[in-house]
Amino acid sequence: MQKIGIYPGTFDPVTNGHIDIIHRSSELFEKLIVAVAHSSAKNPMFSLKERLKMMQLATKSFKNVECVAFEGLLANLAKEYHCKVLVRGLRVVSDFEYELQMGYANKSLNHELETLYFMPTLQNAFISSSIVRSIIAHKGDASHLVPKEIYPLISKA
């Protein structure tokens, strides 16, 4: 059976921090599913279709990465792909508290599911989608925080 990991997120928009985690985690799996979440509760700046397109553009050089859109329980998506490992990033202590709860919740729904946590590299530790959204909302230049393939798409927002 193929070793498959899932890296879920809203990716509103995808950042260099996300791509760093995709790069490092894709080396651990035969296949990495990047699951772009619907996340209507977060009121995303970009539509699910736009976010999926951005992620596909940003990850096109990764041969073992597949991008999918999803709505619903992550534990169910993991079962659908026969995946036993979720990939998550941790930047700050508050991320850990939230991710720990989510990891336990996912484990309670799918007992085979483990969560693998990645710390960001130093140059990406401060980057978040919310920082990027704030910069572009105020007409600032966020090109150094996002993959070059998607900057033209987000700078129009």
Swiss-Prot record:
Entries under SUPFAM superfamilies matching the protein: Nucleotidylyl transferase
Site (Transition state stabilizer): 18
Binding site for substrate: 10, 42, 74, 88
Any one annotated GO CC term: cytoplasm
Any one of the GO BP annotations: coenzyme A biosynthetic process
NCBIfam families hit by this protein: coaD_prev_kdtB, cyt_tran_rel
Record protein name field: Phosphopantetheine adenylyltransferase
